[in-house]
Amino acid sequence: MSLRIYNTLSGKVEEFVPINPPKVLIYTCGVTVYDDSHVGHGRSLIVFDVFRRFLEHLGYQVKFVRNFTDVDDKIINRAKQECTDFMTIADRYIARYYVDMENIRVRPADVEPRVTEHIPEIIEVIQKLVEKGYAYVVEGDVYFSVKKFKDYGKLSKRDIEELIAGARVEPSEKKRDPLDFALWKASKAGEPAWDSPWGKGRPGWHTECVAMVFKHLGETIDIHGGGLDLVFPHHENEIAQAEAITGKPFARYWMHNGLVTVGGQKMSKSLGNYVTLREVYTKYHPDVLRLLVLFTHYRSPLDFSWEKMEETLKAYERLKNAIEDLELLKKLQVVESKEGGTHPLYEQVKEFEENFYASLSDDFNTPEALSHVYKLVGELNKVKNKAYSEGKITDRELSAYEFASKSLLNTMKKIFGLLEDLYPECKVERVVERELEAGQVFDEKLIQILIEARNIARKEKVFKVADYIRDKLKELGIVLEDTPAGTKWKKREGA
């Protein structure tokens, strides 16, 4: 089955054919480090984290580069507000970024370059553009002449005149044309600056990524990614510079994730309607945010709300419980099956895996892939509910449940980065806590299972867990009594 992805450049879904298989070169634009990352940043990070995992599953050798913009007007302004230097601000928020990434389970990129570490490479790119006549110097500033690049607008599907009329461009009296953009900015008092052939200054935003791609990946890469809001002007300007220098395609495929909105408005710091990743992962398990992102197709807008987080939490718990329930089922009476042949779950797992990967191969359709996940969860729940109602499970059913739940767990870990803190043999105390909090203790069969779990904990000298089960049962009106003949239980009067 071939992978097909939507290419912003062509405007259609195309078969993915790498330049030099099995190697795949990917670059995505990283954050400007002047504040904490918000859910909008998190969506892009999660989308490309999962896409990278899927490519690796397909057997590709992925080299993934994601940069830091660590010198910028916003960083400089933040430094002035705090009466410190820009690098202190950048270092602080890069450190906090790494904490955020660990907490939302996003793997580090293979290379994570900083702009300030690539000033010579940036200057080299600008020099080539000046030499080729695509850039001009005015009083220490250097600008790219947009009209000199004939293919300008091919990514955003707009012509030059339309762009001039409607684009957000940075005005300047020094520009020859309103659409021209800065490659190098002459130094200003109190701002960071580096030596260059045009005098002291600092790089413009659009040149940084070109220089870092050239250095770490080469002149043409397989995939360039980022948020939809970067198509114009940022990615359009990257194409203009890179292809003006090399005469080659800068990237074969351009992938853009949709924006995160709040009440229909783009989530952004300028509008003040943002929610930081820290706010989310201090309230919810990181898998809940990952699931929220994956429940929406990567190219569609995602409207964030705390209500949606609550809905997603329920979906997360349903998935997690289906896997953890294996431990409870093992505590039931296991009887020999009288049925022959393999259990239907084995075929359902095969069907799940085929459909799951087919959905991801069709323009990375994660919501459709998740529909197959929850179909399998439903089949697991049928087996579980039957066993609970009968107070026993056949060896045939238990083996099939174990096979299916472990298959599901491995797929979720490997591809979606979900349930990474669960193991095939799930911790009994976690299952016990969930069942107790669900208030299901008056089911006699379940009480016996919990007593058995407590006995195991005592035998293994995990007294914290044993005491937790006893105390929690007591809170819910069940009193345990340890006797030479075993543990007995009774309902507390009035319970």
From Swiss-Prot:
A motif ('HIGH' region) lies at residues 31-41. A motif ('KMSKS' region) lies at residues 266-270. Its cofactor is Zn(2+). It catalyses: tRNA(Cys) + L-cysteine + ATP = L-cysteinyl-tRNA(Cys) + AMP + diphosphate. It is found in: Cytoplasm. Zn(2+) binds at residues 29, 209, 234, 238. Transmembrane segments: none annotated. Pfam families: CysS_C, DALR_2, tRNA-synt_1e. Binds 1 zinc ion per subunit. Keywords: Aminoacyl-tRNA synthetase, ATP-binding, Cytoplasm, Ligase, Metal-binding, Nucleotide-binding, Protein biosynthesis, Zinc. Monomer. This is Cysteine--tRNA ligase. The lineage of its organism: Bacteria, Pseudomonadati, Aquificota, Aquificia, Aquificales. The gene is cysS.
